[in-house]
Amino acid sequence: MASTFTATSSIGSMVAPNGHKSDKKLISKLSSSSFGRRQSVCPRPRRSSSAIVCAAKELHFNKDGTTIRRLQAGVNKLADLVGVTLGPKGRNVVLESKYGSPRIVNDGVTVAREVELEDPVENIGAKLVRQAAAKTNDLAGDGTTTSVVLAQGFIAEGVKVVAAGANPVLITRGIEKTAKALVTELKKMSKEVEDSELADVAAVSAGNNDEIGNMIAEAMSKVGRKGVVTLEEGKSAENNLYVVEGMQFDRGYISPYFVTDSEKMSVEFDNCKLLLVDKKITNARDLVGVLEDAIRGGYPILIIAEDIEQEALATLVVNKLRGTLKIAALRAPGFGERKSQYLDDIAILTGATVIREEVGLSLDKAGKEVLGNASKVVLTKETSTIVGDGSTQDAVKKRVTQIKNLIEQAEQDYEKEKLNERIAKLSGGVAVIQVGAQTETELKEKKLRVEDALNATKAAVEEGIVVGGGCTLLRLASKVDAIKATLDNDEEKVGADIVKRALSYPLKLIAKNAGVNGSVVSEKVLSNDNVKFGYNAATGKYEDLMAAGIIDPTKVVRCCLEHAASVAKTFLMSDCVVVEIKEPEPVPVGNPMDNSGYGY
């Protein structure tokens, strides 16, 4: 088998570090040693004798307050740009694209990522507040614009106080303590989301789009709250929803070199084959037969094993990077006996055979007959989703029945919980929402809205819901006075007052985007003691927002508050900025033949 592998030019040539095909001497060496030594895959670079040149830096001290003002100018430019998208009557932002048509977006974090300011100090300020949006997007998937606006409020109110001579260390400590206490109050205001409210949560996040809200709620009802819902770009102008058999688990790719989409940092394969191995893969030679079949068949292959040792992994990575194989690998989910059970579940879903030595199957003799089939595979750094091709539904039903019998026999609650998780992964399937639009530009913008709505719905399922429209943050401001009594000194209490004033910024901006005076709206909302009472910017009415379906996920509001406070703390504690001095661009050298009498 080793000789077959090395003789195959598509794989055997991968071992040679200089990129040329292996000669006979190299093949003979490989046949007598372990395949693909580390130094042959990743040769050690020669030590360079050239000196490292460091770019000069420019220092900006905040002696007269100009540096902080420039940082704040960057914050305000980014926040004002992102802020136009906030609320049901927020507008879109058009982003220039160097290649292709311009992008029209209504998503805060997408806009924030595109901003690069010419002034280096202002650009650092924009980058600081961008962190609030990015972190909120990572954890909650929605609320990015609110995070930026709230951070702008914290910074604006904080800069005024610090400029007046307050101690920024104690001020930021007060902000931190107040934000932490308000998170506790927020959880008290939260309620568990009902099935009938899921559509409202999604619709609000999608800019009051009821069609998107109802579709996401329908998807949740089909696969369950813990089911998996994914998005695809459709080929028609209409949105579509369908459910296919699938499974998701908390294991990501072993190496980032397997990534096929560098923007999302994910691996995506269609019509993929799966190799399941219930042991550690130590030698790449054992995979020769399976890999050669994959090359001849031209299909992508996913390897799921207990682990893959470094030398074998390096061989797979090099083959992938050179385009020889469409391949990815991940560690099997679970540990011990549960790991074997998960592998069996995946095998039944995909029609694969698990390679186990105790049943007489060895990896080096395995062929394509042991491979499973998946219509789609998506791997990220932390999760993996496998969508079956629908040909194993009868086997899946039998497997679910077996697991239900095990639940009846189980004595411990933990064991029952894990068995129920396996049933959900097997029988819940994957709901796929195909987003349709008339043009590519509209499709990109619409997909971002649906993605935000889906993330908001998942966040609502996790931690519950609160009143939306910026009213919950405004109501939290009334809790600050009680929190101030627990703080240690007057300057920390000033920090609490900063939080209190900043909490009204999102509601005021929502009202402003709807063409209404934000201060008037804020006062009218607070004049009513009913916590559900607020301003519906979509209709222009003051009403019970919970009954009107204006709902925010608690997790989103919590992340906005925590991350905005964190960014403000970092900003207010800054007193000096270091930036690189931009080197002047070289003047293009003219043609020495011009005007010499010899040119034409």
Swiss-Prot record:
Family assignment from sequence similarity: Belongs to the chaperonin (HSP60) family.
* Key words of the record: ATP-binding, Chaperone, Chloroplast, Nucleotide-binding, Phosphoprotein, Plastid, Transit peptide
Which species is listed as the source?
Arabidopsis thaliana (Mouse-ear cress)
Q: What does the entry give for GO biological process? A: cell death; chaperone cofactor-dependent protein refolding; protein refolding; response to cold; systemic acquired resistance
Q: Which GO terms describe its molecular function?
A: ATP binding; ATP-dependent protein folding chaperone; mRNA binding; protein domain specific binding
Q: List the expressing tissues.
A: Expressed in leaves, stems, petioles and flowers.
Residue stretches in coiled coil: none
Induction comment: Up-regulated by light. Down-regulated by wounding. Not induced by heat.
Phenotype seen when the gene is deleted: Normal germination, but chloroplast-division defect and late dwarf phenotype. Lesion formation on leaves when grown under short-day conditions. Cpn60B1 and cpn60B2 double mutant produces small albino seedlings.
State whether it acts alone or in a complex, and with which partners, per the record.
Part of the Cpn60 complex composed of 7 alpha and 7 beta subunits. Can also form a complex composed of 14 beta subunits only. Both complexes show ATPase activity. The Cpn60 complex interacts with the Cpn10 complex. Interacts with RAB during heat stress.
Q: Where in the cell is it found?
A: Plastid, Chloroplast stroma
The record's function comment reads: Binds RuBisCO small and large subunits and is implicated in the assembly of the enzyme oligomer. Involved in protein assisted folding. Required for proper plastid division.
Name the chain's protein.
Chaperonin 60 subunit beta 1, chloroplastic
